[in-house]
Swiss-Prot record:
Protein's name according to its UniProt entry: Kinesin-like protein KIN-1
Gene Ontology biological process terms in this record: homologous chromosome pairing at meiosis; megagametogenesis; microtubule-based movement; pollen development; seed development
SUPFAM superfamilies: P-loop containing nucleoside triphosphate hydrolases (SSF52540)
Organism: Arabidopsis thaliana
Record text on subunit structure and interactions: Homodimer. Interacts with WIP1 and WIP2.
Binding site for ATP: G87, Q88, T89, G90, A91, G92, K93, T94
Length: 465
């Protein structure tokens, strides 16, 4: 059981952001490779801890090696993987995913997609003697809630179907077999040329669609004829900014609304997945958008998943960046347990389980911890966000530390309340004695009796209320 890998990447400041005269301009102050302090436009500070933070001087190679390489390697070995770039328009999603160009780009600037393609075929060629591989490539765009085949534009409305053994499928989508990275990149370039490009005030060439690159890697073992299939999906999401900020109108406004609807659906699915069982049962609204439906297997756990939160470093975009980072924090709590989709030989299926008692206990413990954290994380996160203590609940150890801290603080304040009450009791006792003495001095036995009855009943009600 592993968490989703969530990283943030701050691109260099644009020339417009550099010209901003109102501030020194930068909203993130690095603490270490995983943690930074974020300052919003009201100068409130939030500390974020993610799996890795890439600042403006980070290289494309570093992002690939940390975020994508392990997922690509597993996909070649039959474990599904998904890599998503998320963030507002102009935050660096496409730069991170593709680089300045897929084919004719210098080595240094190459994005995740061409690196994944090269890495995949390199790994395949180094293990060709133990297995035969078949790689197929598809490429689709989700635009205005329609899935369009970017490798065959006549297929403008691909249907999404579900199959018990293969999971989510794009019915009739073009799947081109590719035998090396040059061929794969050529097809990707064809697909990219077909991508719908809209215009908004914020970025004259911003893409207004989600784009998914899908690789199916089938491995036929030379030795025992076992077949493993790994699906690797890379998704470059459309920009997540608010429609009103773009100043868009007409069709562009409709595009922005549709994009926001599908990104909200993605947020809702993540919320449902990370909120634990609810009164409504655990309904996960995958069907609310094409995007969440296509990502259903990835989000539902049968896939390794990495999310790159692309951010502007500028205070001008602080509110969008804050919501991007909060989205990332939320996604971090999705639990994934990807399995290799291996078709076993009959002999392998008969083999007795070699799982030890300790391993079973470990698994049960993990499940218990998982349930506990699912229920507690939301409450804790809300409290800590309110208190300005944004944190990363990476492990149960962290949950326990946080709990211990809260419990000890609660005990301290209860102790203080008990001390105050004891002092109050002492003061009242002294007053009581004084009143009784006064009554005796006045020689009024009847009044003393009434007074003492009054005091005892007041005393009793004080301590039972
Ligand atoms: N890490 C980076 N290093 C250098 N330049 C970058 C980096 N990230 C982004 N840029 C530049 O910033 C600009 C916007 O980036 P990009 O087009 O990737 O944004 P985007 O998030 O994909 O936007 P959209 O939602 O419109 O697709 C581009 O000119 C890009 O070259």
């Amino acid at each position: 059981m592993s968490n989703v890998t969530v990283c943030a990447r701050f691109r260099p400041r644009s020339s417009k952001e550099m010209r901003d005269p109102s501030r020194d301009g930068v909203c993130a102050r690095p603490i270490d490779a995983e943690t930074f302090v974020f300052q919003d436009d009201k100068e409130d500070e939030f500390t974020f801890s993610l799996d890795r933070v890439f600042y403006e001087d980070s290289t494309q190679a570093a992002v690939y090696e940390f975020l994508a390489l392990p997922i690509m390697r597993d996909a070649v070995n039959g474990i599904n993987g998904t890599i998503i770039t998320y963030g507002q328009t102009g935050a660096g999603k496409t730069y991170s995913m593709e680089g300045p160009g897929i084919q004719d780009c210098d080595e240094h600037n190459k994005g995740l997609l061409p690196r994944v393609v090269h890495g995949m075929f390199e790994q395949i060629s180094s293990s060709n003697d133990i297995a035969r591989y078949t790689v197929k490539l598809s490429m689709v765009e989700i635009y205005m809630e329609k899935v369009r085949d970017l490798l065959d534009l006549s297929k403008a409305n691909i249907q999404i179907k579900e199959n018990k053994t293969q999971g989510i499928l794009l019915s009739g989508v073009t799947e081109v077999p590719v035998s090396d990275s040059v061929e794969a990149l050529q097809h990707l370039c064809t697909g990219l040329a077909n991508r719908a490009v809209g215009e908004t005030q914020m970025n004259m060439s911003s893409s207004r669609s989600h784009c998914a690159y899908l690789f199916t890697i089938q491995q036929d073992s030379v030795k025992d004829k076992r077949v493993k299939t790994g699906k690797l999906i890379l998704v470059d999401l459309a920009g997540s900014e608010k429609a009103d900020k773009t100043g868009a109108e007409g069709r562009v406004l409709e595009e922005a609304k549709t994009i926001n609807k599908s990104l909200s659906a993605l947020g809702n699915v993540i919320n449902a997945l990370t909120s634990g069982p609810s009164s409504k049962g655990n309904h996960i609204p995958y069907r609310d958008s094409k995007l969440t439906r296509i990502l259903q297997d990835a989000l539902g756990g049968n896939s390794r998943m990495a999310l790159l939160c692309c951010c502007s470093p500028s205070t001008l975009n602080a509110s969008e960046t804050l919501s991007t980072l909060r989205f990332g924090m939320r996604a971090k709590h999705i639990k994934a347990s990807p399995r290799a989709s291996e078709v076993k030989s009959a002999k392998a299926q008969e083999e007795p389980s070699s799982v030890t008692k300790d391993e079973k206990c470990g698994r049960i413990l993990e499940k218990m911890k998982e349930r506990m954290s699912n229920e507690d994380i939301k409450m804790l996160e809300d409290v800590f966000i309110q208190e300005g203590i944004i944190f990363s609940l990476d492990s149960m150890a962290e949950v326990e530390t946080v709990y211990e801290d809260i419990v000890s603080k609660t005990i301290q304040s209860l102790q203080q309340a008990v001390d105050e009450l004891q002092q109050k009791v002492k003061k009242l006792e002294a007053e009581n004695i004084g009143i009784q003495e006064q009554a005796l001095r006045n020689h009024e036995p009847g009044s003393v009796g009434k007074m003492s009855r009054f005091i005892s009943s007041w005393y009793a009600s004080f301590f039972t209320s």
